Amino acid sequence: MHRNSARIVVAGQPVNWLGANFWSRTGGPLMWRNYDPDTVRKELAVLREHGLGMTRSFFYWPDFMPEPDRIDDAMTERFADFLERHAEADMSTVPTFIVGHMSGENWDPPWRDGRDLYTDVWMVARQAWFAGEMVRRFGAHPAVCGWLVSNEMPIYSGGSAPREVIAAWAQIIRDAVRAAGGQQPFSLGDGAWGTQASSQHAGFALADAARLCDFLGPHVYPVGDDEVRQHYTAAWECELAGTFGRPVVLEEFGVSSDFVSGANAARYYRQVLHNSLLAGATGWIGWCNSDYDDLAGQDPYRHHAFELHFGLTDSHGRPKPQLTEMKAFADTLRAVDIGRCQRAPADTALVVSSYLDTSYPFTAPSDPGYIYDTLRQAYVSARLADLPVALTRESEGVGGDAMLYLVPSVKQLLAPTWHQLERLARAGATVYVSYSPGSAGWHRGPSYGHLNAMFGVEHQLRAGLVDAIEDDQVAFNFVKDFGTLAAGTRLTFRAGGNEHSRAYLPVRPDGAEVLAADGHGRPALLLRRVGAGSVVLCTYPVEHMAAATPRANPEATSAIYEALGAHAGVRKLVTADDRRVACDVLVRSDGARFAWLVSQASEPVTVKPELAPGLWLARLDGSATDGAATLDPFGVGVFRLENAPAATPSTP
């Protein structure tokens, strides 16, 4: 299956953005009142020295548009100088029009007077006029490389609105930008916050944004209870956004030094940068360029003190560890010539239930959050199993070109989808489904359409009840060889979930063969051969159990996924012998292949990757390795995959 690697195009050339969200340390959001060109020059210089080539900048709306029909010329003169400082540093910027929300506070021009930003016709016209005026003044400057409508409009607007209203608002602003001559890449700046890329209901739909925008821009600041999931959440949201075929820019990510130590901040940046690259991201804009210790008495920093310390540099311009990590990432991008690289195709598809992104009548409000968390955990397990995985949305039609379909801990799909999955299996694919009754008491149970016939079992469910998992640790004892798992193998899983979801599916085989039994001798993993392929049923919600368990990863689901991949014939160019190390491959347009090894181990680890026949592992400079790779704690290694030289025939 194709995996999205779309690139932003600027002036006819594909580009990758690496930069910082920018407020000068002279004023934060009030920088335009206290603008100092020399300070900006120094701030940009340190970013450029560390490999960053662009910024995201902001028109602070109350200052730039003090009256509904007037632009403040003093502010625009300062922004013009700001663009010159970028040109001087050989950098570019993406201005943001409606600001709006910033760093824990909403900032209104006084003339808004509570008007609705989406439905008040006069108010929408004022926004469109302002965007058009900024484009007319600055759109021809070579330092402008894109446009954003807002900063996190779902927060600034004060609530949600119907999807069609928000789409119309976005189109009006987009049309104003284009009418004013703005041909640079355009997007919304909304954070990609909506049920198509998260479990949030904000009225914004990525499908609409993809139709209107040149790229999609997730803002990701996860809070969780599992470090590995933290490291993959930004990548997961980039994958979800990428299903719409547009370039994906990780528009905001970062950490406050008040919350995270310097070493751990660097580690987090490293993981987010590399994992999101492997998830198809084409740009990375960290939050933000500087600390603001001198602004402690100024809102929003006065009441959100942690916002003082999100910087890539401290308040004196000295690089923090996360900026050093961005430089290392920039060096890697340059070494592999990232603009010419694409993700290798995938043989594995992760099925995204339409109940994540579609509102069906009389379904539980908690369903989208449950699905998001479960799918994210399944994605982590697939990555740690070294399975190149593509997402396929049920709402867009499940793609038919994968060898392995993962349907993890699922309560419900549409009835026709179950029959489609069985047809895919009959045509030669392997379809894996793990059971879940869902996490809500509403319609509790598997809505599978034809469960018994599809999986070759007879379920033993009882009216209104779930079969609770009473063991704190669930055991899978393999009674038959399956893929990479030999008979006699024992896998264990920590049980998790609530009174509804911590449940297994009692079944009797009726045509399916039992691959593994639980600790009580009940079927835990079953296989039914159908046509040229097979369906595999897991009677425990192993992905949901892990998703509901703190500090769960790495865990044994990745071993099941690895076995599924082997059973299905999934092709992998590189795989590690340690489930704490994830492998993936980028392919350059000249045929060069680059292997990424990303460690989730808290200590140094040495692995000897298993390579596809005819390949050997080389350093980026082309020199040979001994076939092994040593990674620092939570480290990343990037290598070339070279063709092994042909053997020289021996002479008689």
Model-derived features with residue positions:
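A short helix->loop->beta-strand "cap" motif at the edges of active sites that frequently abuts
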Residues: 91, 182-184, 244-246, 426-430, ...
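Aromatic- and carboxylate-lined catalytic core of secreted/periplasmic carbohydrate-active enzymes
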Residues: 275, 279-362, 375-388, 453-498, ...
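A conserved amphipathic helix/loop scaffold
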Residues: 412-652
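Active-site beta-loop-alpha junctions enriched in small/polar residues
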Residues: 23-25, 60, 98-102, 150-152, ...
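Acidic-and-aromatic substrate-binding clefts and catalytic sites of carbohydrate-active enzymes
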Residues: 32-38, 63-73, 154-157, 192-201, ...
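Catalytic-core region of carbohydrate-active enzymes that cleave or remodel glycosidic bonds
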Residues: 173-176, 181-185, 210-211, 215, ...
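Active-site mouth of glycoside hydrolases
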Residues: 2-208
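Phosphate-binding active sites in nucleotide-utilizing proteins
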Residues: 368-413
